[in-house]
């Protein structure tokens, strides 16, 4: 194989390596946890990822002791938990 062909192959492999994590990204393991309202009694609007619905859902958070499936906004929830095939 010529040096030009090797450079092309190397370039394609590099591009594939860079793009693969974006296209096959999986959600964080905490996204499978049930929503945890916490022990406190504050009424804070929060979002959690609901795997059965494959979307983020609003819930009322008590204000402390949250698990990893707890987000301040729908956008943050979707960024962390939605899969990108």
UniProtKB/Swiss-Prot annotation:
Protein known as: Kunitz-type serine protease inhibitor homolog beta-bungarotoxin BF B1 chain
Keyword line: Disulfide bond, Ion channel impairing toxin, Neurotoxin, Potassium channel impairing toxin, Presynaptic neurotoxin, Secreted, Signal, Toxin, Voltage-gated potassium channel impairing toxin
PROSITE patterns to which the protein is assigned, alphabetical: BPTI_KUNITZ_1 (PS00280), BPTI_KUNITZ_2 (PS50279)
Keyword match Secreted: yes
Tissue: Expressed by the venom gland.
GO molecular function, one term: toxin activity
Subunit-level organization: Heterodimer; disulfide-linked. The A chains have phospholipase A2 activity and the B chains show homology with the basic protease inhibitors.
Family annotation (InterPro entries): Kunitz_BPTI (IPR002223), Kunitz_BPTI_sf (IPR036880), Prtase_inh_Kunz-CS (IPR020901), TFPI/VKTCI-like (IPR050098)
SUPFAM superfamilies referenced in this protein's UniProt entry, alphabetically: BPTI-like
Disulfide bonds: 31-81, 40-64, 56-77
Gene Ontology CC annotations of this record: extracellular space
Keyword Signal in record: yes
Signal peptide residue numbers: 1-24
Record domain BPTI/Kunitz inhibitor: where: 31-81
Family to which this protein belongs: Belongs to the venom Kunitz-type family.
Subcellular localization, as worded in the UniProt entry: Secreted
